[in-house]
Amino acid sequence: MSAFRNHCPHLDSVGEITKEDLIQKSQGTCQDCKVRGPNLWACLENRCSYVGCGESQVDHSTIHSQETKHYLTVNLTTLRVWCYACSKEVFLDRKLGTQPSLPHVRQPHQIQENSVQDFKIPSNTTLKTPLVAVFDDLDIEVDEEDELRARGLTGLKNIGNTCYMNAALQALSNCPPLTQFFLDCGGLARTDKKPAICKSYLKLMTELWHKSRPGSVVPTNLFQGIKTVNPTFRGYSQQDAQEFLRCLMDLLHEELKEQVMEVEDPQTITTEETMEEDKSQSDVDFQSCESCSNSDKAENENGSSCFSEDNNETTMLIQDDENNSEMSKDWQKEKMCNKINKVNSEGELDKDRDSISETVDLNNQETVKVQIHSRASEYITDVHSNDLSTPQILPSNESINPRLSASPPKSGNLWPGLAPPHKKAQSASPKRKKQHKKYRSVISDIFDGTIISSVQCLTCDRVSVTLETFQDLSLPIPGKEDLAKLHSSSHPTSIVKAGSCGEAYAPQGWIAFFMEYVKRFVVSCVPSWFWGPVVTLQDCLAAFFARDELKGDNMYSCEKCKKLRNGVKFCKVQKFPEILCIHLKRFRHELMFSTKISTHVSFPLEGLDLQPFLAKDSPAQIVTYDLLSVICHHGTASSGHYIAYCRNNLNNLWYEFDDQSVTEVSESTVQNAEAYVLFYRKSSEEAQKERRRISNLLNIMEPSLLQFYISRQWLNKFKTFAEPGPISNNDFLCIHGGVPPRKAGYIEDLVLMLPQNIWDNLYSRYGGGPAVNHLYICHTCQIEAEEIEKKKKNRRKTELEIFIRLNRAFQKEDSPATFYCISMQWFREWESFVKGKDGDPPGPIDNTKIAVTKCGSVMLRQGADSGQISEETWNFLQSIYGGGPEVILRPPVVHVDPDILQAEEKIEVETRSL
């Protein structure tokens, strides 16, 4: 054992253990509260057989350690060992069976004792041997037991007006790609970020899909975690199921996301090389996934305000280096559902050129502008339209990956120092390789799609093309007049009057609003055939993707003309997601009223064809979808009840999930439902055949001389995706081809071993890679990790010493002239960092929760969770982290009357004389 591993003095107390013993204990229960796993903890003290629950329950394992002074315990799910006395993870000699040795690597320097466990550099020089894939790992056939008594039919108890959450969770639970990830790759649900939503979701999925099939479970842990992050869901009022979905998916993405470094192809044209900074506010008004036909002049003129305050609706979180987020506001939901994520190919800019010319001819000398949004700034790429005839490759959609998420950042100034260089395009500049940061998670892999939208000025013919990532499509429900226009049109993308889709979404006065309210009430009381044809989901999609004339009060602010101009706006899908989430905009919220559109929308259970909405040059091959689940709302806008209809993937039957009640229903019942949110999954019989073929090959188990390591995450895609894409082993490899030191401790959770014949078949079919026959800890990454940790340690020490010195000086002041207030939430994050409890420094100072503006002045919010520091301390912290705003308290100055002061002095003199 190395000196580093021997640093824990309590390892000598470990008794003799075997892997079989731990497996047997993992199938048991906590000896105190009788709760089952996962994540039970077994005491490793010699001759102690105690097994207790962890933090997700009552944490009896910690209580046992405190009472008995037994410091070492092992997690029976991950087999990782924790020492309570040393407050860190420790590594045992291999007592659980022989493991292949790795080449010796330089041992890391000893790290500060109170440093957080996850940024300690794993010092074990061996890796656990990953399991060999067996038939069950790739088996897609349903067991006879599951056909007779299908799993996943467990209800969720209502814990106080939480039907919105229960319906959303059941709908997500019946999305096989996501659920199978947590069931088959549960070891990947690890995070240091609080409140660890991914761990709570893993526990919930394990309970819902357990073979014992309990009648119902209580999602308390998950609900408490979400309420901690998002105050919207606190209390007992009814909330929106779609907002909960977006919040949950965003939190899961944030906790599970991984940064991937990728080198561009040398022939690619990097967007950064042609970027020019453009602060025009009008450029923000492009396609929103809320509706292609929604544009607002006010938002054109006030684009810079799109990252501000409130948290009622959603906006996007484009990933870079940031972590946390909150929900956004109502009007942002209409315009900011998407931001640019990826740039696929310059040929994509040509995709709608022919259809554009139907309205007006393009001038070959004009410029097509591609606008790329990021959280730090805006990027504008100008491409001459005469280049559009020759498609050139821009960075692939794997290279630049700012990503749509469910919520905006905590504050506007959350990303200091993230403004990348803006360079003027050089026509003759040499192509060069370049690295881009990108993030991905199981959420983005499953739910992210891409839309290409264009706005053309009808005066100067300038076309602005925007590529946007969406996680769901919010579709308007067209009215009778809109349906007539859509159905009478011979072209599927013919122009529809701006704002006409769903007249309820246009600005209205009080009288118009009241008349519309009465009209809707009457409509809801009269059979739909009286009012016209039935609205279908295809109608809603057609209305969403319809061309939109920008004129009148809805004119387009042209950057070239520098004026408001008439324009035309349209969009198509460049990349469809594996699971398409569709939200029907049934609710409309005014200042004092809320209304609901109760129009029935007909939707198919199978064979939703999205070919008419696919971009011309899109590489997508599968555009047909089958319904997985649908969330329904019964009632009015102010009150009601949510339920979910879901198709069980094991027996293909439909069930109604109404809180803790689960009932089988017919397909006609589902089709007659008042759909609010729908989940569709790509349909591919070819993918099913390929999975059966590989499963049969694996069952044969031909002897092979070589074993190949493959990513568990990619195998999950192969089992559940219609288009799994190329094999990707980058989730367990570093850029040097080895295993990153941080992942060495749980490599068995990341990979499986395949026989050579299975690897050859998968590789020939899907490509990708790289092929891996040997696992080793990367020496280069280990050295880099040591250097990074050394710098962090020095930074912590410096910041802590300066703060203590400044704070002591502040405490000695008798009557300071000013106090600076600081958010205690941010301060606790900073304190955890400088004390070594958290591996990463906090973001910018965020005083928005403790500040309130009155009469133009920033004041301390009453009852705010804040602390007081000196001006020098504030300047010190602000110079490092930035942020704000400044919240200053000035003690009142007591003005003493001069006559009173003179009288007091006279009395004092007389007293002395006596």
Curated annotation (Swiss-Prot):
Cited SMART domains: DUSP (SM00695), ZnF_UBP (SM00290)
CDD domains: Peptidase_C19R
Family annotation (PROSITE patterns): DUSP, USP_1, USP_2, USP_3, ZF_UBP
Any one biological process term the GO annotation gives: protein K63-linked deubiquitination
Species of the source: Pongo abelii
Ranges of compositional bias, category Basic residues: 421-437
Matching PANTHER family: UBIQUITIN CARBOXYL-TERMINAL HYDROLASE, UBIQUITIN CARBOXYL-TERMINAL HYDROLASE 33
Protein name (Swiss-Prot/TrEMBL): Ubiquitin carboxyl-terminal hydrolase 33
Modified sites of kind Phosphoserine: S345, S407
Subunit record text: Interacts with VHL, leading to its ubiquitination and subsequent degradation. Interacts with ARRB1 and ARRB2. Interacts with ADRB2. Interacts with DIO2. Interacts with ROBO1. Interacts with SELENBP1; in a selenium-dependent manner. Interacts with CCP110.
Ranges where the record places region Disordered: 266-313, 387-437
Record PTM text: Ubiquitinated via a VHL-dependent pathway for proteasomal degradation.
Signal peptide as annotated in the record: none
Origin superkingdom: Eukaryota
Chain ranges of zinc fingers (UBP-type): 6-109
Gene Ontology molecular function terms on file: cysteine-type deubiquitinase activity; cysteine-type endopeptidase activity; zinc ion binding
Domain DUSP: 685-778, 786-893
GO annotations of cellular component type: centrosome; perinuclear region of cytoplasm
Chief place where the protein resides: cytoplasm
InterPro entries: DUSP-like_sf (IPR035927), Papain-like_cys_pep_sf (IPR038765), Pept_C19_DUSP (IPR006615), Peptidase_C19_UCH (IPR001394), Ub_carboxyl-term_hydrolase (IPR050185), USP_CS (IPR018200), USP_dom (IPR028889), Znf_RING/FYVE/PHD (IPR013083)
Keyword terms, alphabetized: Cytoplasm, Cytoskeleton, Endocytosis, Hydrolase, Metal-binding, Phosphoprotein, Protease, Repeat, Thiol protease, Ubl conjugation, Ubl conjugation pathway, Zinc, Zinc-finger
Record remark on domains: The UBP-type zinc finger binds 3 zinc ions. However, it does not bind ubiquitin, probably because the conserved Arg in position 55 is replaced by a Glu residue.
Reaction(s) catalysed by this chain's protein: Thiol-dependent hydrolysis of ester, thioester, amide, peptide and isopeptide bonds formed by the C-terminal Gly of ubiquitin (a 76-residue protein attached to proteins as an intracellular targeting signal)
Positions of the catalytic residues: C163, H641
Subcellular location(s) per record: Cytoplasm, Perinuclear region; Cytoplasm, Cytoskeleton, Microtubule organizing center, Centrosome
Residues holding Zn(2+) 3: C43, C48, H64, H70
